[in-house]
């Protein structure tokens, strides 16, 4: 594999960190973003370095187009062009629609969906010019089936795949693929913090495989989609949920 640069938004989270480390293990030069004002970024980078990973991280407000543009300009100048973009940044503001405020709606839509436009817009022209590129959008099983208390999150995650399908038509003949992955319950710190009795009684019974997914399993799917071997896969939404939702 030629040395390629991958940009992972939200790379310091539980799933994002696994994506970063596993892609580095495959020989990619990995760059990630962090929210301006994030006081843990230096600590995270130091921790990664102690494990043998020399990542570079750049501040970017993924909800702000100009901030994303400035971030990618720096990456282009200091690292090189982005060959693979993993749109992984996301938040939740879970509550019933009755209780949801406009601010709760906007925060999730801007972070989870607007960010996909904001970041992809900065890198796509370069991918097309080089006749090679990968855009991988990390959605969710709840974008496929919906979830109680997640009208904002489910709408944003479903919207990501609409973006994937439409854009894949535009760049298919330019060597650029655009795909969505939709993870189910993955064993990140956020999920494993759920009380065990809730996991055992409410969540695991929904999953035919009877367990949580592993972050490295999701990372493995992304590595495949980023590879030359996946050149014939575009416009797809690939489920990785242990059979929780089949479509």
Question: Which positions does each model-derived feature cover?
Answer:
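Alpha-helical segment proximal to the catalytic Tyr-Lys
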Residues: 125, 169-173, 231
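Conserved glycine-rich cofactor-binding loop
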Residues: 12-13
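Active-site helix of classical SDR
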Residues: 120, 156, 164
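Conserved glycine-rich Rossmann-like NAD(P)H-binding loop of the short-chain dehydrogenase/reductase
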Residues: 26-43
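Substrate-binding pocket helix/loop in short-chain dehydrogenase/reductase
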Residues: 96-97, 104-109, 191, 203
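Residue(s) in the substrate-gating loop at a strand-loop-helix junction
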Residues: 140
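Short, small/polar-rich loop/turn modules that mediate ligand/substrate recognition or access, typified
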Residues: 172, 177, 233-235, 241
């Amino acid at each position: 594999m030629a040395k390629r640069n991958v940009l992972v938004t939200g790379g310091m989270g539980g799933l994002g960190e696994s994506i970063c480390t596993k892609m580095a293990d495959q020989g990619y030069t990995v760059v990630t973003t962090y929210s301006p004002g994030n006081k843990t970024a230096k600590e995270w980078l130091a921790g990664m370095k102690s494990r043998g990973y020399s990542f570079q991280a750049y501040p970017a407000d993924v909800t702000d187009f100009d901030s994303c543009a400035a971030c990618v300009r720096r990456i282009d100048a200091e690292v090189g062009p982005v060959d693979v973009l993993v749109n992984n940044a996301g938040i939740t503001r879970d509550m019933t629609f009755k209780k949801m405020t406009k601010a709760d709606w906007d925060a999730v839509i801007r972070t989870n969906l607007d960010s996909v436009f904001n970041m992809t817009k900065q890198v796509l022209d370069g991918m097309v010019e080089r006749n090679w590129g990968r855009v991988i959008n990390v959605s969710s099983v709840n974008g496929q089936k919906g979830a109680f208390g997640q009208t904002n999150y489910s709408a944003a995650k479903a919207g990501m795949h609409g973006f994937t399908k439409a854009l894949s038509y535009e760049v298919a003949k330019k060597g650029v693929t655009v795909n969505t992955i939709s993870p189910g319950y993955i064993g990140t710190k956020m999920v494993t913090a759920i009380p065990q009795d809730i996991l055992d009684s409410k969540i695991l019974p929904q999953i035919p495989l009877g367990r949580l997914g592993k972050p490295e399993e999701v990372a493995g799917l992304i590595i495949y989609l980023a590879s030359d071997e996946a050149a014939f896969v575009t416009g797809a939404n690939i489920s990785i949920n242990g059979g929780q939702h089949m479509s």
